[in-house]
């Protein structure tokens, strides 16, 4: 029944071709494969309005296709799925005669399919082109309600071919018997993915000579399982599918195409973007390949490792260099997981015949790919892994949640080798609360933590606003976290506190304002008022000095011996140990002041070091490219030289002998 319907359709198309196209086109000659494929497509388009895309072809349309017409909507969708320009499709519609007669009969439909195949093969869209032997047309369609696949057998072993019915179940083309399994294993699979050597076994490469001059869609890349025909292939008499002498016809081997339909991703996109869109299965495969090179997905792959991996794809060095330039968005000589996926996808596309884009497509941008990764693995893992590696007292905190309670907690920390009473603690808290501004919103991360974080590539900078910037704004510097107590000379700590303590009253001398009022204390600690007052001499001018002084002047200030401050009276010796408490409180700003110039210098040096490393990597890559190019040119030179010698020998033999 099917063969009769196909023959009737072909006969009707061939008989009506002369009148269907206007000015006497040549007779429409179809091979058996084209007859079966075209009649099947016509039946689907004719029955799409009634049966829907998931139903099989109606029997009425298949038995008598000459009496049916294809619905305009399904035909338009099918033609758009050829991915030809709208102008070309309009020209095909005019040439096939459908625009003149007002409908798509079998004749117009078949001629249009031949013209689509000619346009996809690079031939001009003319009626004369349908005389040539052409491959079957290729279509790529998308449906939101489900996945629909049109499939052809992987390879033709004879002159008869059967096209599977339309199905809406993913991977639902089933084998009918063991004979089909043998045929499928001996036929090349139709997955268009040509992955590097480290791909899993089911990612099989399809040679470009087998009909894949381009990727049809990004969806096809990651569906490795072959889509088998529902019905067994019909073999000509006297031949067997498993015989070693069986070879497909040469022209039919180039006719085979697999046109598939993949469900669109979450956001709709135009057809030109589809090849550059990474599917879920592709992303999973790329991530697995990345983890084989770098177990930590939040880390990166160095340029040398990526180079050794990608050169296995056998692409030329200039193409690989261009892919690297496209994918390495931040130009740091290393690939993160999104950049690796983009580079891998570009290499796979190039291996399958797609020309490389002029710029990185939007669907391969690192921001787009990073948003597609699961958040627990990508957004939080870098920070969590770093926090786990630090001791408990050095872990970074949330920089936007600094409260006064943290300052008070710092004040509550016991000072070694000291007997601090509760009243002393309250006094110290009040002093700190007066010194600090009300709207402190930054965490006092140490320069050590800041530098260690900056030294890690691609990680966020958790460092707070520098002391120099805070002083320029006239604000007080953030209090550093507690450090192991160090012995500071009294004069040194006093001198450093001139610069970094806020403007508060100091001593009671005639030259300086009186000290701040402190809560009452027991008698043994009354001298703390004097010691704390002496810790803050001449502080009213500190902010202006800090705003005007440059780092160079501060360095000079630190290198000079500290000058003795004006004292109101001499302290007894038994109060020397008690004075260590405010000295310890001042040691934090003193240490911060000593280390203040270092973050800027280290930041500059780290930037310079990173720039030098990037330049070294780029030079090494360029050197490798030039070395390979040099070897290729040397080989060509050697071949040309040998050719020249051979030609000279031939010329010498052909030259007539001159007799003197």
Swiss-Prot record:
Gene3D superfamilies: EF-hand. SUPFAM superfamilies: EF-hand. It comes from the Eukaryota. Interacts with EPN1; the interaction is direct. Interacts with EPS15; the interaction is direct. Interacts with EPS15L1. Interacts with RALBP1; can form a ternary complex with activated Ral (RALA or RALB). Interacts with ASAP1; the interaction is direct and this complex can bind paxillin. Also forms a ternary complex with RALBP1 and ASAP1. Interacts with GRB2. This is RalBP1-associated Eps domain-containing protein 2. Residues 34-147, 282-373 form the EH domain. Keywords: Calcium, Coiled coil, Cytoplasm, Metal-binding, Phosphoprotein, Repeat. The lineage of its organism: Eukaryota, Metazoa, Chordata, Craniata, Vertebrata. InterPro entries: EF-hand-dom_pair (IPR011992), EF_Hand_1_Ca_BS (IPR018247), EF_hand_dom (IPR002048), EH_dom (IPR000261). Expressed at high levels in the cerebrum, cerebellum, lung, kidney, and testis. Weakly expressed in the kidney. Isoform 2 is down-regulated during progression of prostate cancer. It comes from Homo sapiens (Human). Ca(2+) binds at residues 328, 330, 332, 339. GO terms for molecular function: calcium ion binding. One of its GO terms (biological process) is protein-containing complex assembly. Residues 514-660 are annotated as: Interaction with RALBP1.
């Amino acid at each position: 029944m099917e063969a009769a319907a196909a023959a009737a359709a072909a006969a009707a198309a061939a008989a009506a071709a002369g009148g269907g196209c206007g000015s006497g086109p040549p007779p429409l000659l179809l091979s058996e494969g084209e007859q079966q494929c075209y009649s099947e497509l016509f039946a689907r388009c004719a029955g799409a309005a009634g049966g829907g895309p998931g139903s099989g072809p109606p029997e009425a349309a298949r038995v008598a296709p000459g009496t049916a017409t294809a619905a305009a909507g399904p035909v338009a969708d099918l033609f758009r799925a050829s991915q030809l320009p709208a102008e070309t499709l309009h020209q095909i519609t005019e040439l096939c005669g459908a625009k003149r007669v007002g409908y798509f009969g079998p004749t117009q439909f078949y001629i249009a399919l031949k013209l689509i195949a000619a346009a996809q093969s690079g031939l001009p869209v003319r009626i004369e082109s349908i005389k040539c032997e052409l491959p079957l047309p290729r279509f790529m369609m998308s449906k939101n309600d489900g996945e629909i696949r049109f499939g052809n057998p992987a390879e033709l072993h004879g002159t008869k071919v059967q096209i599977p019915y339309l199905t809406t179940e993913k991977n639902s083309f089933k084998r009918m018997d063991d004979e089909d399994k043998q045929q499928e294993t001996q036929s090349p699979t139709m997955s268009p993915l040509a992955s590097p050597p480290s791909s899993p076994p089911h990612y099989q490469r399809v040679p470009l000579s087998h009909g894949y001059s381009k990727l049809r869609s990004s969806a096809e890349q990651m569906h490795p399982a072959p889509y088998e025909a529902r019905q067994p292939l019909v073999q000509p008499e006297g031949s067997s599918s498993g015989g070693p002498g069986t070879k497909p016809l040469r022209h039919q081997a180039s006719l085979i195409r697999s046109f598939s339909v993949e469900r669109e991703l979450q956001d709709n996109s135009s057809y030109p973007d589809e090849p550059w869109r990474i599917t879920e299965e592709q992303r999973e495969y790329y991530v697995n390949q990345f983890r084989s090179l770098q177990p930590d997905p939040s880390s990166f792959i160095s340029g040398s490792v990526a180079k050794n991996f990608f050169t296995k794809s056998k692409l030329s060095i200039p193409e690989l260099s261009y892919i690297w330039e496209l994918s390495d968005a931040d130009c740091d000589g290393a690939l993160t997981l999104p950049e690796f996926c983009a580079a891998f996808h570009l290499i796979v596309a190039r291996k399958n015949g797609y020309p490389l884009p002029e710029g990185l497509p939007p669907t391969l941008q690192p921001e787009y790919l990073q948003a597609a990764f699961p958040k627990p693995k990508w957004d939080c893992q870098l920070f969590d892994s770093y926090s786990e590696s630090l001791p408990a007292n050095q872990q970074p905190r949330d920089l936007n949640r600094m409260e006064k309670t943290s300052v008070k907690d710092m004040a509550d920390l016991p000072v070694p080798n000291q007997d601090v009473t509760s009243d002393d603690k309250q006094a110290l808290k009040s002093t700190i609360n007066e010194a600090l501004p009300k709207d402190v919103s930054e965490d006092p991360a140490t320069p050590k933590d800041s530098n260690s974080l900056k030294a890690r590539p691609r990680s966020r900078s958790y460092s707070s606003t520098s002391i120099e910037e805070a002083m320029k704004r006239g604000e007080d510097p953030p209090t550093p976290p507690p450090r192991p107590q160090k012995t500071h000379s009294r004069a040194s700590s006093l001198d450093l506190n001139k610069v970094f303590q806020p403007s508060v009253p100091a001593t009671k001398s005639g030259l300086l304002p009186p000290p701040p009022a402190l809560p009452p204390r027991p008698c043994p600690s009354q001298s703390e008022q004097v010691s704390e007052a002496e810790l803050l001499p001449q502080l009213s001018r500190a902010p202006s000095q800090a705003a005007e002084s440059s780092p160079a002047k501060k360095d000079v200030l630190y290198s000079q011996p500290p000058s003795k401050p004006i004292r109101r009276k001499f302290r007894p010796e038994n109060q020397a140990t008690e004075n260590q408490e405010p000295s310890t409180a001042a040691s934090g700003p003193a240490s911060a002041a000593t280390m203040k110039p270092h973050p800027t210098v280290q930041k500059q040096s780290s930037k310079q070091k990173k720039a030098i490393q990037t330049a070294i990597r780029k030079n090494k890559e360029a050197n490798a490219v030039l070395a390979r190019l040099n070897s290729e040119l040397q080989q060509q030179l050697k071949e040309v030289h040998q050719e020249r010698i051979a030609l000279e020998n031939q010329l010498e033999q052909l030259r007539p002998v001159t007799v003197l």
